[in-house]
């Protein structure tokens, strides 16, 4: 029986470049670094997000799975991402329940920026 999501992770090819994006652009704070810096964890809203270069079989991809980060101010975050030069595949868009944008980290992994509307 599944009881929780242990972590969500994204494979990257260049850890310093990835950390510059996730920490410098998105503002995540590293919580733990393991395996000689090949695994970095961030605590985000009660969950764990990890970056890894630990296994060459786990490769970056812009297909399929993505992590979605809840943000306070989606417009400001999208502008910050634009200034960084990162790729944006979906500008800030409205749905019935939220605002959403899709950006890509330096390896092309999808990163969803999300703000839920007030109920």
Name every feature range the model reports, one short phrase each:
Residues 1-17, 46, 65-67, 117-119:
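N-terminal beta-strand motif that seeds the catalytic metal site of vicinal oxygen chelate
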Residues 31-32, 40-41, 57-60, 92:
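Short secondary-structure boundary/capping segments
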Residues 78-119:
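Vicinal oxygen chelate
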Residues 1-4, 58-64, 94-95:
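Short glycine-enriched loop/turn motifs at secondary-structure junctions
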Residues 9-49:
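Core segments of cupin and vicinal oxygen chelate
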Residues 46-51, 59, 107-111:
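Short, charged/polar, Gly/Pro-enriched secondary-structure boundary elements
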Residues 41, 68, 100-102:
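Short hydrophobic/aromatic beta-strand element in the GNAT-like acyltransferase core
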């Amino acid at each position: 029986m599944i009881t929780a999501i242990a972590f969500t992770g994204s494979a990257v090819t260049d850890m310093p470049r990835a950390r510059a994006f996730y920490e410098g652009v998105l503002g995540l704070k590293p919580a733990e670094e393991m395996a000689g810096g090949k695994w970095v964890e961030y605590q985000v809203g009660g969950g764990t997000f990890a970056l890894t270069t630990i296994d060459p079989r786990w490769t970056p991809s812009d297909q399929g799975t993505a992590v979605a980060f809840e943000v306070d101010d989606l417009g400001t975050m999208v502008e910050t991402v634009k200034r960084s030069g990162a790729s944006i595949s979906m500008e800030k868009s409205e749905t019935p329940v939220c605002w959403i944008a899709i950006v890509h980290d330096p390896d092309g992994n999808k990163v969803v920026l999300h703000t839920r509307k007030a109920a």
